[in-house]
């Protein structure tokens, strides 16, 4: 009788843990389904890393081409071309990699959720673009990089409501860096490079390690 009780105890315990594991699996599956339906999860860590590399390449080109003897108008035009080229390359890369990831995760890329995330990201970016044009027109060149960092950070925080919450922390980092740059004159390119180059690469690596490696 004692042996039967012992066997019954171990069987019941094993059944309990099996049911517990199944319950946890069910909870995780439900959580994944809810995230797919309420958040844009096709964000790619590689896209952030490549965006950072593009920014570093653009900053390097700027330091090699622009010299103290370069005319101010030529310098501004060249910097504008570099910034727009980096933005375009990063946007195209992010779009392609996000589309490829959406095919793997089963989330529709062209969905209402995607458009909402893009809209919340684009609105601060467009506003920042208008402010940057105004700065150029009034020749307040020293705060141009600060404004770019600040509004990009705001765009990330605003878009994080519809994607991974960690995107907001990247946005906060950009906002803090832009705020510091406002009071540190003469180092605009350095702060721009740290933000758009270093922060993107660091975030992309951490994002891959925390999210994508677990999914693969």
Q: What annotation goes with each model-predicted range?
A:
Residues 52-62, 87-94, 125-129, 149-152, ...:
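Helical transmembrane-bundle signal
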Residues 39-128:
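Selected alpha-helical membrane-embedding segments in polytopic membrane proteins
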Residues 108-167:
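Membrane-proximal helix-loop-helix units in multi-pass membrane proteins
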Residues 155-216:
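Terminal transmembrane helical module of multi-pass membrane proteins
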Residues 61-78, 133-142, 184-188:
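Helix-coil boundary and interhelical linker segments in multi-pass alpha-helical membrane proteins
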Residues 2-44:
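N-terminal juxtamembrane cytosolic/stromal segments of multi-pass membrane proteins
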Residues 44-54, 82-87, 121, 145-148, ...:
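Hydrophobic alpha-helical transmembrane segments of polytopic
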């Amino acid at each position: 009788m004692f042996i039967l009780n012992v066997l019954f105890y171990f069987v019941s315990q094993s059944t309990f843990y099996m049911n517990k594991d199944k319950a946890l699996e069910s909870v995780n599956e439900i959580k994944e389904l809810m995230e797919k339906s309420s958040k844009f999860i096709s964000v790619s860590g590689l896209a952030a890393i490549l965006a950072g590399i593009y920014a570093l390449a653009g900053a390097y080109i700027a330091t090699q081409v622009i010299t103290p003897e370069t005319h101010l108008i030529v310098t501004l035009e060249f910097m504008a071309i570099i910034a727009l080229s980096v933005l375009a390359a990063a946007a195209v890369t992010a779009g392609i990699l996000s589309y490829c990831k959406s095919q793997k995760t089963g989330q529709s890329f062209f969905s209402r959720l995607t458009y909402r995330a893009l809209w919340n990201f684009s609105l601060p970016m467009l506003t920042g673009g208008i402010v940057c044009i105004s700065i150029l027109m009034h020749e307040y060149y020293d705060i141009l990089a600060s404004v770019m960092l600040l509004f990009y950070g705001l765009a990330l925080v605003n878009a994080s409501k519809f994607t991974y919450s960690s995107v907001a922390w990247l946005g906060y980092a950009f906002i803090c860096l832009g705020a510091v740059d406002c009071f540190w004159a003469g180092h605009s390119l350095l702060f721009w490079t740290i933000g758009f180059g270093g922060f993107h690469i660091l975030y992309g690596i951490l994002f891959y390690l925390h999210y994508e490696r677990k999914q693969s």
